[in-house]
Amino acid sequence: MSARLLPPRTVPELARRRRDPVSKQALAEAAPIVDAVRAGGEAALREYAERFGDVQPGAALFHDRAALGQALARLPAGDRARLERVAERIRGFAEAQYRALCPVAVSVPGGVAEHRIAPVERAGCYAPGGRYPLPSSVLMTALTARVARVRDVWVASPKPRALSLAAAAMAGADGVLAAGGAHAIAALAYGAGPIAPRDIIVGPGNRYVTAAKQLVGSAVAIDMLAGPSELTVFADDAADPGNIAADLLAQAEHDPEAIPVLVTLDPGLPDRVATELARQLRDMPSAAIAQAALANGGVVVVASVDEGIAACDAIAPEHLQLELRDGAGVAPRLAHYGALVVGTGAAEVLGDYGAGPNHVLPTGGTARSTGGLSVYTFLRVRTWLRIDDPAAARPLLEDAIWLGRAEGLEAHARAAERRLGTLTS
């Protein structure tokens, strides 16, 4: 296969080619912007938004519910119907996740221990603009926050088009900030104009967005530090090389730093996919971006299904797509991925565009330790301890006294001892 398209790689080589999602340069450039917006609020936010071309001087920086509703009302009927259909699938999946949650109550000596689940109050949802404005990301983030019962939801997106504003209305957002980059993240974190400081900021963005999320991470929760988009396709000799090429290109066109990978049991498949890649690139508008991304990824040829599973788990990609005769049998054996796509009629793009599961997913191998955006991202588990029968709680008090002294924390032991003393006095 041509080295200019999808070169042969080993799994360790692919791991070495991954970059940290937050570079020193991006941090250095984002930090003064974040500090300025934190100190200067709306005035500083507007200055940066106009400087970076998010809005024209004097143009609206904040779109309230009324403006979003107008954008939705002006949407052509066909576009609105399709957007509603996508939104309903995303909402339905998120609602099913929410229904799976339940409170917990466990009896303890003298009382009960509980956990209760509650949403954060304010969420900020970032949706990329720039090269490819993503109304799908507006739905994936803001709609999921609303399903989680978040009270106050703002979206930030640079140069939002009518479709993105309409998507925000459909998601139930309270408003849209027409700005991106580090200044938008700072506005969400610390507040600016009508935006109160957020409790959590979610959503994918460029390296400056990601750097800013790291910078504000001590003041506000964040979902993840996302790097370039990734797709790994695990295929055998029954796979359609044209479909594989199309799916790899769909991921590659996101970003010249995207990482498309083919893991295959068939040594001949890479050449067939290479032919398809070259053919499909000829008339693709984003060919230059996609071709640059293909060079970041590669092909890993494996000798067995077990070796292929090990390779996929070591890569731990954002998206993992199975093009195997027994994909359904292999799927449960895989451990590390952000989203898994299985079946001859399935494609990763269906997950991107609203089959139901969320498309905001972990990258850079972090799928080993975390999952994608969901209603759980916006929820807090709060624990309760209630003691109704102090006499029955004696074992708790005795154990607390013992542990306090075992750890050298005498005040802890004495606090428990006082309660025990009231039972014997």
Where are these regions (language model features)?
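Conserved small-residue-rich beta-alpha loop and adjacent elements
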Residues: 104-167
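Short acidic-hydrophobic, aromatic-tinged amphipathic segments that line or gate anion-handling sites
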Residues: 1-10, 175-180, 299-304
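Conserved NAD(P)+-binding/catalytic subdomain of aldehyde/semialdehyde dehydrogenases
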Residues: 172-261
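Alpha-helix C-terminal capping segments
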Residues: 140-151, 169-171, 189-195, 213-215, ...
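N-terminal Rossmann-like NAD(P)+-binding subdomain of aldehyde/semialdehyde dehydrogenases
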Residues: 1-121
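A glycine- and small/hydrophobic-rich beta-loop-beta segment
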Residues: 250, 254, 262-337
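C-terminal core of ALDH-fold dehydrogenases
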Residues: 313-425
